[in-house]
């Protein structure tokens, strides 16, 4: 009976370790992982770039990232790599995308949004987009001059 209990305890610890490790496929989290488990952490991250945002996301999506990000997500993957975000480590994983309205994009009154992709409680990707007449997609850094 003790052996069975010990085996069950070991199995439980291994299962918990697997669940807590998330979907990093054996890769360690980056040294500068950005916490984003709460609304406050996500908002603080965007405000840290100089963005003024609406307090609540306008959209929250739960999605499954493709196993292969090099095809249709290639440009987005490059953008995230240039920002030092671990998007590529999360291929095939589940993530949430939080979309916020940006209120202070230079030269554009409305229609600009920030997206944050979050997995395992950290930011794995982010971008700023406008789909209006002046459509664009860029990294999270506040532009030095008007968009």
Q: Residue spans of the language-model regions?
A:
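Stable alpha-helical elements in mature extracytoplasmic
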Residues: 38, 42-45
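Sec-dependent signal peptide cleavage junction
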Residues: 18-33
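Mature extracytoplasmic domains of secretory-pathway proteins
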Residues: 48-109
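Mobile, glycine- and charge-enriched loop segments
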Residues: 29, 35, 61-62, 145
